[in-house]
């Protein structure tokens, strides 16, 4: 099991922003906007938006199942045995690193957490919610890790029924995402007064829809013009994004269904392009 604390991460973000302002010697009014990227880890909050434990230890501050956590191997195997058409968009086989197997694990192994949960976020979307109070989810996170059908602009209800998570779609899927927008779109009324105070910034500063960390790197890498200044041909490029893990990322105008390769994910990095990982 690999677990983290959303309170700890948020405090680190605020400290980093304050340090950046101080080291840059600028006035907060000069900051025109904020964008967030983060790992595709699962954040669980209660109905008041407070941390809710995902840990067998019962520690409430441990409310994040980190992306690399493989506690949901059995749940992933059960989902894969059902061969739902949604799996065509994750390379034919869902990984225990994705969110629906982890959510199924929580439902089966931590019923009190399941009963009291009010929000399930991908970590990048938690950060934008914490910054603005707007619970809009990113198309990047929901398509790549939550089985949202981006090309159809909907959750596939038959998939959630089949795997036993149909309750997540109640109340217009409020717990996992009523509203889904493309990365970079503005959120709500910008930075909330509370978050602005914590960061040392100005309330109302623009905040954009988030993106997963490797996918932010993909956008920058594939879009690079190079020393010759040539225009990027996305259909002929692949990005190698390294960190705690390493991802090979390619986008195309047409969907590519390749067994064992994640995707194709619609508009996960660039609008109207399909991503394979």
Question: Each predicted region: which residue ranges?
Answer:
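Glycine-rich phosphate-binding/catalytic subdomain of phosphoryl-transfer
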Residues: 3-277
């Amino acid at each position: 099991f690999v677990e983290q604390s959303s309170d700890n991460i948020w405090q680190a973000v605020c400290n980093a922003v304050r340090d950046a302002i101080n080291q840059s010697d600028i006035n907060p009014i000069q900051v025109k906007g904020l964008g967030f990227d983060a790992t595709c880890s699962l954040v669980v909050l209660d109905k008041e938006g407070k941390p809710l434990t995902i840990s067998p230890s019962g520690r409430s501050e441990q409310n994040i199942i980190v992306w690399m956590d493989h506690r949901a191997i059995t749940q992933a195997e059960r989902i894969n045995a059902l061969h739902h058409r949604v799996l065509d968009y994750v390379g034919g086989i869902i990984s225990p690193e994705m969110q629906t197997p982890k959510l199924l694990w929580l439902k089966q192994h931590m019923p009190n957490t399941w009963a009291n949960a009010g929000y399930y976020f991908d970590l990048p979307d938690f950060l934008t919610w914490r910054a603005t109070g707007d619970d809009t989810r990113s198309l990047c996170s929901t398509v790549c890790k939550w089985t949202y059908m981006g090309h159809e602009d909907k959750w596939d209800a038959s998939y959630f029924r089949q795997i036993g998570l149909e309750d997540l779609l109640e109340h217009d899927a409020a717990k996992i995402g009523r509203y889904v927008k493309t990365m970079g779109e503005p959120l709500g009324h910008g930075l909330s007064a509370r978050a602005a105070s914590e960061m040392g910034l100005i309330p109302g500063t623009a905040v954009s829809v988030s993106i997963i960390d490797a996918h932010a790197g993909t956008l920058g890498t594939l879009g690079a013009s190079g020393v010759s200044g040539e225009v990027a041909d996305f259909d002929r490029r692949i990005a190698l994004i390294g960190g705690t893990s390493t991802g090979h990322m390619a986008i195309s105008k047409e969907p590519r269904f390749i067994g064992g390769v994640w995707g194709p994910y619609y508009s996960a990095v660039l609008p109207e392009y399909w991503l394979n990982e």
